[in-house]
Amino acid sequence: MSLPGLELSQTSAEREFVSAPPTQISLSKGSEWRFEVAFGTAIRVKLLSGTAELFGTELAASQTYAFSGTKAAIYTWHGCTLEVGAGDTISTIDGLGSAGMNGGAVRGYGAGGCQSEYTAEETPMVEYANVHFALEAMRQEAKATGKDGPRVLILGPENAGKTSLAKILTAYATKVGRQPIVVNLDPAEGMLSVPGSLTATAFRTMMNVEEGWGSSPMSGPSAIPVKLPLVYFYPLQNPLEAGASVYRPIVSRLALSVTGRMAEDEDTRETGIIVDTPGILSQGKAGSLEVINHIVTEFAINTILVIGSERLYSTMMRSYDNKPTASASAAASDERITVVKLSKSGGCVDRDAAFMKAVRESQIRTYFFGNPIPSTASAALSASASSTTNVTLSPHAQQLDFDSLAVYNYTISLPDEDEDEYDPSQLGTGDTFIPGGSNEAERAEPQQAEDSSFTPSMPGLAGSSGEDATSAANSAVPLKKVPRPAPTVLANSLLAITHAAPSAPSSEIRDASIMGFLYVADVDSEKGKIRVLAPIGGRVPPRAIVWGKKWPGEVVGLVG
């Protein structure tokens, strides 16, 4: 890039970086190596001697691990020596190197090209290990008495290390042969799914060091056994934006599914569940305590872990400590809730909006195209045994008639939303603007039977069943079918295919679990066609589809 008037060239930081030989880092017992790697760059870490773990999952000796776009820490209980070197530059799916992705992230000048890296002697790992041992004692008691195992709720502000603690407790549980159910209630980040997902997964095997939680089922080799998540879709970033009408009912359905699994699976019943929550619930905003209480009640929580907030800890102590749980067996066993305060790790760093956007894009790309990080673990499964082999998936592209789809959108107005943006799905409360339509909100009679492709789900409309309870439940759900023509803003967004029928009531669509996701690559409103990517081939199932317009929002550049 030339500088105007000076006739000089400015060399990019990526070009200035010269790959240095690997660096050896020695850690004393009870210390950890904290590092940050930008998206688009990668480092390689190898355990040369001793023992080490990343968020509770042990690193194998002499095995090279690749990390990109992450902020993490490698801890050692007894001391170890690590070898850290630079990895390959990773290109995005659209073919552009991500050195300038999301604000111009470039390779740093730390070991291996880390943006930041240092060794820390003070860590809260002893506290976290003590929590694991306490939970293990509760599991042994549950096995002896036939009661349910511990149901753990993790609370804390943003960037306090809640998800890291959930990974540590899960890894330690699986290490001793337990099978915990992990529940993610944070729509900002996906767990084994895309952002906007609320998921529950039973972990029977170890987690993937490079990919965090691991990977969901895919048609390709995997060094770590894949996980089978149960997924629900909440297409909003903030659980308080539609807490009463959308978020809490989905949490109830998820809790019901988890409870049913624990009733049928003795191993998961004894091990219990670990619930990760969004940080906004800990900020004291209106409605947050109601959502926390709903989670505590629905999952029959008996252990609340609070990280990094004295105020929240005090509130939880007053509200729940030593109070009876909501478990069905609580009355007979006199089970009580325990509130525990934990220290926030000094390695927790703030993740800005640009980094979180890159995280969301990476999760969505991985869902459709596989893991872009070159991994020697996946290379070991390849016949070529190439050190740069990575798991690449090929999504199926197809063109669909928009009229053949039942696409629904949540009609919730956000404070920072542009109300002038044209979107046919936001016009009116009925189908007045559709040719031949009429405004059902002004009529007392039910919807005509010939319009079977549309189910009344807007506030104030009477359901075809005529039952007051069902009608009231459906009218409370801010879910409306997107009318034709296909809105152009549908492009570059996600569609969630539910298990609900296309004409199911709005409450049933909201509460339905997800089959999979589509990515809308292009929209032709004149022809009524949309071009989508699907993880598998074949026809799109005739099911109700929920549009992730507000969250995870627009994802540009996924395809060329």
From Swiss-Prot:
Signal peptide: none annotated. It holds the Pfam family CLP1_P. Residues 416-479 are annotated as: Disordered. Keywords: ATP-binding, mRNA processing, Nucleotide-binding, Nucleus. The keyword Acyltransferase does not apply. Gene3D superfamilies: Clp1, DNA binding domain (2.60.120.1030), P-loop containing nucleotide triphosphate hydrolases (3.40.50.300), Pre-mRNA cleavage complex subunit Clp1, C-terminal domain (2.40.30.330). One of its GO terms (biological process) is tRNA splicing, via endonucleolytic cleavage and ligation. GO terms for molecular function: ATP binding; polynucleotide 5'-hydroxyl-kinase activity. SUPFAM superfamilies: P-loop containing nucleoside triphosphate hydrolases. ATP binds at E32, K71, N159, A160, G161, K162, T163, S164. The keyword Glycoprotein does not apply. It is found in: Nucleus. Its main location: nucleus. GO terms for cellular component: mRNA cleavage factor complex. Required for endonucleolytic cleavage during polyadenylation-dependent pre-mRNA 3'-end formation. Belongs to the Clp1 family. Clp1 subfamily. HAMAP family: Clp1. Component of a pre-mRNA cleavage factor complex. Interacts directly with PCF11. This is mRNA cleavage and polyadenylation factor clp1. The gene is clp1.
